[in-house]
Amino acid sequence: MADTSQKPDKATSAAQARQVIDVFHEISTLLNAELDRGTLSICISLIENGINPEALATVVRELKKDADEVRRQIAEGGVRNGE
């Protein structure tokens, strides 16, 4: 019979995962990174699966820059096709 006494149950694992995300979210907030818990969770999963953290950071910065530009264009009267 397998010894399951050392394996955390799903509820414990989920609680630990939430704690990790909460800590990363707090760090993100302190650094003004503006990353929500869902985004942080995705980033952590990508890094755990071998994505280069520096490359991921570059992509996140570029996406944020693009989103800011779209918001600026919308505020100025809308986004035009091809721009």
UniProtKB/Swiss-Prot annotation:
The UniProt record lists the keyword Cytoplasm: yes
Keywords (A to Z) from UniProt: Cytoplasm, Cytoskeleton
Broad class of the protein's primary localization: cytoplasm
Gene Ontology, cellular component aspect: cytoplasm; gamma-tubulin ring complex; interphase microtubule organizing center; mitotic spindle pole body; spindle
Subcellular locations according to the entry: Cytoplasm, Cytoskeleton, Microtubule organizing center, Spindle pole body
One Pfam family matching this protein: MOZART1
InterPro entries in the record: MZT1
Biological process annotations from GO: gamma-tubulin complex localization; microtubule nucleation by interphase microtubule organizing center; mitotic spindle assembly
Sequence intervals crossing the membrane: none
Biological role: Required for gamma-tubulin complex recruitment to the microtubule organizing center (MTOC).
Protein name: Mitotic-spindle organizing protein 1
Organism of this sequence: Botryotinia fuckeliana (strain B05.10) (Noble rot fungus)
Source taxonomy: Eukaryota, Fungi, Dikarya, Ascomycota, Pezizomycotina
